Amino acid sequence: MDVKRDDALGWRVFLKGGTEPTERSALDWLHELNHLGAGEILLTSMDRDGTGDGFDLQLLELASRLPIPLIASGGAGLEIHFLEALEHGADAVLAATLFHEGILPIPRLKAYLAQNDLSVRI
């Protein structure tokens, strides 16, 4: 689910790779997906995507109130960002830019998470 902060809706849902805004609130859509039986949600903060500024922790905290497992996406730049996302409700974390650009080696991230008592597949 691609979402972007919005003054009226909190977070607005976008379609088609984030190019088409909807009138749906992300939290309303999460509730509907829960009702429909979704198994997990890939939740991407478009505002944070590619910034390296960290995941949208407020969004994760709100979304994690539902029983659907969440994969946090958008904003990772440092090892601690992954830990913060997991501490704020994400069940899994996803990143692309910092791996593709060689900013953070995956083995280093896995070691960091393991040192912080998080289960990782090494």
Please report, for each region that a protein language model flagged, where it lies by residue:
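Short beta->alpha linker loops
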Residues: 47, 76-80, 104
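C-terminal helical cap(s) of enzyme catalytic domains, especially alpha/beta-barrels
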Residues: 83-122
